[in-house]
């Protein structure tokens, strides 16, 4: 697996961001783009802060994720500037002095107190598009998040630069390292909490550094789509293991899911293999010009074919889709955009001017409705689950005869299956970012 050096790609990435910012400012009628990194938030009636989360608009420009009270200023025709907050503080570790592949491209101003930024920001706040959260306000510099600017920038974030793709490949490698450690822990009989800790140790990131909370689900827990409880006692017997977990690389996320059967549970292992084969066909369908909504509908038909083959449903895949039976077994979307955010922005945008492309009727949880374009990175994450609440709704709707309930009873103790890769849409064939990382890790 060939890894590109993101440092060598950064200058071109920055040039793209500058062009986008210039166009966005023109759309909104502003002279300056001002992006605060964000501030620490404190728990109510307490002096403890929540884990800091950097403004995604900030980390699009810089590979910095732990620099609160800093700012980026872009003015067309000038070098971008960074106002870098490096306080005098003996209570906490302060950010290291600016270094790395990005520093030569910016005018850098070090400040020791947040209010020192006021003298370095553009003179007239009314001429600034300030992108951030309300808590980032400093004096008269209050985030206004003008829609023409935000819509333009978020739409074009859907197309990743080579620099971004290089970092996303790094995040795949880290995530796969954790997935391998987690599977090994499962095979050794570990509980969910211990599996989670093995994952974090292998990745080298704690829960606050990971892009989202790990889903580590044994047996029936896999039927809870976002199960994050991390049980301290392994169930007996161990039947199945679903893990949905990623990693971060300089602010870019990976989002990977795998499902495993315990030794001796051959029929469930066969169903996992069938879902995996179907998922690979879905990944291959990621092509420019293909409507992601159609990919989602096609996924329903493919997954219902798996259930038909395993005797779980009695009707055709098309009938299962039309009657809502398929939604009981596959109740989420096929995936989403990913990049700086796990659920990256503008998944429903009609254009860089805004607007919204609605989800297809009957599919309320799909997170992406756009037509695929080169440079987009999407997740492909089909799943099959045995969720009593949803299956009871099928009965209540009068479609219980479509399901073989004995087969449901057989598979219910396994919870469910989900397989998830990240796929880059290119000018030609789909580029799966996840599978090569697993292949390299497996030697």
UniProtKB/Swiss-Prot annotation:
Which keywords, in A-to-Z order, does the entry hold? Dipeptidase, Hydrolase, Manganese, Metal-binding, Metalloprotease, Protease
Describe how the cofactor binds: Binds 2 manganese ions per subunit.
PROSITE patterns noted in UniProt: PROLINE_PEPTIDASE (PS00491)
Domain of life according to the entry: Bacteria
Chain sites annotated for binding Mn(2+) 1: 255, 336, 381, 420
Manganese found in the keyword field: yes
Q: What EC numbers are recorded for this enzyme?
A: 3.4.13.9
Gene Ontology CC annotations of this record: cytosol
Q: Which cofactor does it need?
A: Mn(2+)
> Where do the annotations place Mn(2+) 2 binding?
244, 255, 420
Q: Which GO terms describe its biological process?
A: proteolysis
Q: Which Gene Ontology terms cover its molecular function?
A: aminopeptidase activity; metal ion binding; metalloexopeptidase activity; phosphoric triester hydrolase activity; proline dipeptidase activity
Gene3D superfamilies the record matches:
Creatinase/methionine aminopeptidase superfamily (3.90.230.10), Creatinase/prolidase N-terminal domain (3.40.350.10)
Q: What is the reaction catalyzed?
A: Xaa-L-Pro dipeptide + H2O = an L-alpha-amino acid + L-proline
Question: Pfam families, per this entry?
Answer: PepQ_N, Peptidase_M24
Which PANTHER family has this protein been placed in?
XAA-PRO AMINOPEPTIDASE 3, XAA-PRO DIPEPTIDASE
The record's family statement is: Belongs to the peptidase M24B family. Bacterial-type prolidase subfamily.
The free-text function statement in the UniProt record for this protein reads: Splits dipeptides with a prolyl residue in the C-terminal position.
Mind telling me what this protein is named? Xaa-Pro dipeptidase
Which organism encodes this protein? Stenotrophomonas maltophilia (strain K279a)
Its taxonomic path starts at: Bacteria, Pseudomonadati, Pseudomonadota, Gammaproteobacteria, Lysobacterales
